[in-house]
Amino acid sequence: MLANQPDHQIDKQDRIRAAVEKNPRKMTLQLACDLGVPEVEVIRAFPADRVTELDVGRWEELLRSLEPFGAVRVLVSNGAATIEVDGQFGGFSTTGEFFNVQTDSLDMHIRWRELGAVFAVEKPGHMNGMATRSIQFFDQTGAAAFKVFLNFGGPIAPESETRFAELRAKFKCSVSGQMAHQLR
C-alpha cells in the first residue's frame, strides 16, 4: 500500500481485499454491489497472481488479438440486464465513435474513448469453481464495459491457455492503473 494514501482509502482497499479472499467464486459485480464500490476496484483487489492490468491505450490491438481464440463468451451488463453471447471476434472496422466487431456470431459497437481499464483475469467460476480466464474491459467510471471469457464452465483448451499467457505478457501495463488512466 502507498504511504501517501489516506487511512480511509487503505481501510476500503483492505475491506475489498478481504471480501475477495473470503468469496473467491462470487461474481465481481455482486461483490462490488455488496461493498458499494465500482467493479474495477474489486478486480484491482485480486491477488497479483490472478489479475494483470493491461495497457488500455492499446485497446484496438488487444481486441484484434482476441480473434485467434475462436469462440468465446462475451458478457455485457448494465443496471437492468446482463447478456451472455457466444461468438468470435473479427470483422473489425471503425465508424464514427465506434470500433466495430461484426461476425456471424458477434456484433459489438464499442465506444472506445470510454474505455478506462482492461485486465487479464483468472478466477474460480461462480457456478462450479472451475478456473476461468477472461479479458475484462472497464469504462472510465469503473463499471464493466464487457468481459471476454476464453472458457466458461469448462476447462480451457491448452492452446488458449498459452495464448492467454502470451497476451497477458504482451499487453501488461507498465504503470499502475490509476496513473495510466491519468496519463491518457
Question: What are these model-predicted stretches?
Answer:
Residues 1-184:
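Eukaryotic intrinsically disordered, low-complexity regulatory linkers and tails enriched in Ser/Thr/Pro
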